[in-house]
Amino acid sequence: MGAVKVLPYYTVAEWEWWDGKWELIEGIPFAMSPAPLPKYQRIAGNLFQEFNLQLKKCRHCKVYLAIDWQVKEDTILEPDLLVVCGDIKRRLNFAPELTVEILSKATALKDRNNKF
C-alpha cells in the first residue's frame, strides 16, 4: 500500500511573501499562466472598454483588469475582469458585482473546476 500524500495548505498571509504569480484556492497554490496571448488580451481589452462605457455615469462602480481578490483567509484569486462597486485599498476583499474569466485551453480546467 502506498503512502498517502498530503497537500500543503497555505494562507493569504503566507502567499504575500511568494515570488511569481500565484492564485491560492482553499489553501492550495496554483501557478498562474505566463503573459496572455494577444488574442486573449484583445478580448479582455474589448470587454473592459464596453463595461467601462456602460458604467461611465456610475460614481460607485468601476471596471478592473486582473486585480487580486481575497475571497477568504486561504483563497486569493485574480479574475481577468471585475466590476466592483465600492472602494478597494490594497486588494479587493468583498464580492465584486461581476467576475469575468476568459477561458483558454491552458486555464479552462482550473477556472471551471477549482476557481469558481
Residue ranges and their predicted role:
Residues 1-116:
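Gly/Pro/Ser/Thr-rich low-complexity, intrinsically disordered segments predominantly at protein N-termini
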